[in-house]
Amino acid sequence: MFSPGKRNDLSAKEFRKKLKLYSKYNNLFFASPSRWLFDCAKESLLTKNKPVFYIPNILDNTLFKPIDKTAARLILNVDAVETVIAFGAITVSSPYKGWTYLQKALELLKQDDSLKNISVLIFGSAYNKEIADAIPFKTRFMGYLLDEYSTSLVYNAADVFIAPSLAEAFGYVVMEALSCGTPVVGFNVGGIPDMIRHKENGYLAKY
């Protein structure tokens, strides 16, 4: 199916089909939510000769906004004295979500005896025993959150949000957490650097 260099490779077929389609229209425009995706489009053989615009995604900041951390923790039944690390993914085990990197980071934190009362909040996915057993701190799985208010509560209850994604066209969770006033740690990949200002509202790690 995927055989690089071969004419009948599926990706080559899709490329030719798209190239034929795009060449039919002179008024075809492309919009990118991140500078990274914008640069990719400008370099692509499919779109480099087409107008490409960088238009960041928007967010309803009447829903995602800072609220009192103590109140958020009270609603979620999270201990007020804990240092809370939040992480969100529909499929935690997806290699693109960077779970293995977060796991290693948590193991390093555990080795620091000066750090006490750390807990981890995971939302977006159901309880996963393998993941839970791999985390050296108290962990709560919040499940799939059905509304923005509940998601906002998690961001506000957290001291830091971790976005270890290895591939992200934009990264809505990053924007949501920052809009709630919660610093974000993430890799300098995809659209994440568009939102995290290194050591100002978060930390950009090299990948």
Q: What do these predicted ranges mean?
A:
Residues 183-186:
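Short hydrophobic beta-strand element within catalytic cores of glycosyltransferases
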